[in-house]
């Protein structure tokens, strides 16, 4: 019994460390504002969650966020880190709610549900909470935060949807390719 708990905690630690390393290598998408970055760490969270369950996925997200803060710090007054954590939850948790049959088609449906959730939640969270909060804390005018077009709604549709759709597709595809190989060691 104790051996199983130690093994479970060790696996969470390994997945958290791998997710942290991938989170440190985030990259911006050139036409988007520089603070919108893609990292592939959610693919590790998905794999860890599928191997160990939704509680483990939640712990991996929390540990990854804390470790990234310790190693990298923050340049967005913790708002970017909060956004990354909340959006990771919105992407990963629908995968566990769907409970499609464990086939490739089922996995694609689950990841599709996660991508849909990520895109919708990111739009709502950015438009109503994160950007206004960042604008207020950083004393930056709301209009200057996003500079793609004059229409703020189009900017959000352009930047937030493109970024999160790309992130969801990349992370989901990476998780699908790696997941089968990881299950051999589970």
Predicted regions located by residue number:
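Loop-helix junctions at membrane interfaces
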Residues: 1-186
